[in-house]
């Protein structure tokens, strides 16, 4: 099946149309989820982008969902130090340091950083480096994306890195849908028919029920999506 000419970036362009108060707000909503990124997520991304990427314009699952704003990324300020401390590890994989720094600067601009303080000295933890992520989770109630088993062992709510593949698949499919929806609305009679169908759906009990489902439940459903299981 050929790739659609409609890129997932259309989501970012049209997202405001579907936000509360926007002209399409009553017709549908675009899924968006807050996720906390662990340092191992960023380090893996840096290694891929600087040593394995063949197409300079190619994007990883992570980068795409960040750029199209399907994922709103969060991290404790501690992550910055942890990532920069591991630049040498990435360079050791064959990357040029300047490429690592450039990609990190781009990624950092897509992450919301929160200072949650340091690790309490009077408490013992399985892995003290994971504490800032758990503290941030308690503050903003977002799931942590990590490959570190210690986070879950310390009662952190986690999801595997494979979730980004599922979220990218959603983003691409949703981009096609909203592009056709918006374009159809502006194309006269064809758009009017589509708009009527969407409006009927929006006013149905099904639509009302869907909008009441917490986003954490949607995330759990995405994690169980067949596309996600194929990437494990």
What are these regions (language model features)?
Residues 150-232:
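Acidic, PIN/NYN-like endoribonuclease modules and their adjacent C-terminal/linker elements
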Residues 111-143:
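Active-site neighborhoods of divalent-metal-dependent phosphate/nucleic-acid chemistry enzymes
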């Amino acid at each position: 099946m050929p790739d659609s000419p409609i890129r997932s970036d259309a989501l970012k362009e049209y997202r405001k149309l579907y936000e509360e108060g926007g002209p399409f707000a009553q017709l549908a909503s675009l899924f968006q989820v807050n996720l906390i990124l662990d340092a191992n997520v960023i380090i893996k991304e840096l290694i891929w982008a600087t040593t394995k990427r063949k197409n300079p314009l190619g994007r990883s699952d992570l980068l795409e969902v960040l750029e199209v704003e399907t994922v709103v990324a969060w991290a404790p300020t501690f992550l910055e130090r942890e990532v920069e401390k591991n630049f040498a590890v990435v360079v050791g994989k064959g990357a040029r340091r300047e490429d690592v720094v450039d990609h990190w600067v781009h990624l950092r601009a897509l992450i919301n950083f929160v200072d949650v303080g340091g690790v309490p000295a009077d408490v013992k933890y399985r892995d003290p480096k994971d504490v800032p992520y758990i503290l941030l989770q308690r503050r903003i109630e977002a799931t942590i994306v990590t490959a570190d088993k210690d986070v879950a062992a310390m009662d952190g709510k986690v999801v595997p890195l494979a979730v980004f593949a599922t979220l990218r698949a959603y983003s691409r499919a949703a981009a096609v849908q909203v592009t056709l929806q918006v374009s159809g609305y502006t194309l006269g009679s064809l758009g009017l028919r589509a708009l009527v169908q969407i409006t009927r759906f929006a006013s149905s009990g099904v639509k009302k029920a869907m909008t009441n489902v917490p986003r954490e439940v949607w995330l759990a459903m995405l994690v169980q999506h067949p596309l996600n299981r194929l990437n494990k």
